[in-house]
């Protein structure tokens, strides 16, 4: 085993987490219950090796050659076409188990040497281990295999099945011989399925995160913690047209997921702990940009601690101009600058009636100026911190009814600690969305309408910041 030489698995965020890949010539156990993605991870490992012109050997002891090929084909990895067909050898031993376990090991060792394998997958090692009458025989054979692959620098994955209903590997002896152990799990969270990868052992490796989330959407993909992505070739936000009965979210993917929002709808976005401000900026900022680039007005109450300057900086990244902001945007603040820009309005933190009148006056001006429905965005826990709960609820009820008549959108955002207000807001909302933080990965789901779980990542390919919604499957 060569600690300084790293063999990338091809799963980018996994490789980044283990110093660039598996130690060269190492032997790693990949364990999990049925359906957790063990074979897919192993196939990605071999396919990526083929892309690097490294020879690989897949030894099938459980499902057979055709099942493996079809499984990989479904995620866009054709193992029968170059480069995989040139560099990956598939040894199907399902039909020759009757030859005896010693003969099986001899066949495997010969094929490794003949093909000059640099990557090896044994799927599954559990099937091989169960064929031995004694546990000591498993250890002896594993020692022989380990000695060979290390001597030729062949990096090996041993796939092990954890029986359904159990969480431990259960084979015992081999866990002391292997250099690394990666365990794949599924768990349920608020009715949604999450997939987790845990690295419990990786000899000679600094592990960034012991546990990572992953998805099987489009292959085996480990989800990175949310991070800002640089924008190359800046461009103006591209407006997404509205439909006769529905308004665009400003996100093509989110429009596909939700079908847009009904005209006149109130939308509640419930926020969990530790949601980065950039996520919120991209989610509602994109809605804001879509309204403004379509000539519609936007009226908003930002969250506490969010400056007008930060909001306008994001608008500039969308390509919005100062003229557009002055004409189409109104940001309500409690204590504005001495000479605020034209898009900043003052609301009185001590007088809810006066604040509502100011809000209504600006809304009337925007409706008259644009001749179009407007987008209203409010962080309602900020209002609750200033005004009595019953007054805040009454103001929300009235604004929700007015929004239906106006045909625009009212987006309400609520942070943890305002559960009573969140329940009330959910009752008046046509759509209820949720954002949570799980190990640094920001998860999105629709509560109403019900959607599957998505991981959010920043995408700057189009010339301006956008969110990418990756299904958790």
Residue ranges and their predicted role:
Residues 27-31, 266-272:
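Short hydrophobic/aromatic beta-strand immediately N-terminal to the Walker A/P-loop
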Residues 93-150, 338-401:
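Phosphate-binding/switch loop-helix module in NTP-utilizing enzymes
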Residues 33-92, 274-342:
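Conserved P-loop
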Residues 9-21, 249-261:
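Pre-Walker A adenine-sensing motif
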